[in-house]
Amino acid sequence: MVYTRGYLLLATFFALVALPGLVRAEDLRRTAIVRAIQTSRDSVVNIHGEKFVSDTGDDAEDRRVNGMGTGVVIDPRGYAVTNFHVVDGVREIEVTLASGRTVAARLISHDRRTDLAVIKIDTVDPLPVIQLGTSDDLLTGETVLALGNAFGYEHTVTRGIISALHRNVDVSPTQRYEDLIQTDASINPGNSGGPLLNINGEMIGINVAVRAGAQGIGFAIPVDSVLRIVTRLLSIERIDHTWHGLVCRTCGTGAMIET
C-alpha cells in the first residue's frame, strides 16, 4: 500500500510538471496568423450570382457565367464593401455568410473609376464587422494575409508580405488603379473584394487585381482610400445621384453607417 501510494504521488508529480509544457505547446499552435484569421473570418462573405458576358466575333452572343467574389462587412446592419467588377452585371446577388447561410443582397452604390461598390445584405440579425487598420503606416516587408473566395473555395487564407507601396496599375485601356499595395500573398480569381489583413487581423486593403502571367504579384486598394470612397458612396449626394441619407464614419471595430 505504501509503494502504491508512492507511485501515485510520483505519477501525479510528473503529470503536473508536464502540464505546463502541454499548454505551451497548444499556445505555440495559436500563432499571430491564426488569431488574425479568427478575428476577421466571420466578417468576410462570399458573393456569387449569374451574369451575362458578351462574346466577341461574328457569332457573338451573350453567355451566362457564374460570377464570384468576396465582400467585407463594414456595418452590423449588413452593409459590405467589395469590388464593383464583382457585382457588375449580376442580376441577383447572393451572399454566403460565415455561418454557411446564403441570403440575398442588393447593390447600393458604386464608383466605377476606383472599382469599389457597397452592397446591402438582406439580414435581420446583426453581422460581425471587420476591424479596420490604417494604410498610413504600412511597412514594406511586413506580413500580410489575404482572405477570400478563391476559385470558389470560401475563406481561403494565403500569407505573404507587402512587396511595395504606391503602385499604379493599368489593367485595361479604361481601367487604371492608383496608389495600390503590392503583395506576394496569393490572390486568385474570387479573391477580388476580400480583405488584405495585417498580422493583427485588421483590414489594411481590399484585394483587387493580379499581374497576368506572373506569380506572386497581387494588388490591393489601401484601406484609407477605401474608406474615403465608401464615405462618398454613402453620403447624401451620391456619385450616381441616388438619395440614401447615409453618412459613414470610422469607429474602433468597423465603419458605422449612420442614418
Task: State the predicted function of each range.
Residues 24-258:
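Serine-dependent protease modules
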Residues 9-18:
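Bacterial N-terminal signal peptides
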Residues 1-10:
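Bacterial N-terminal signal peptides that target proteins for export
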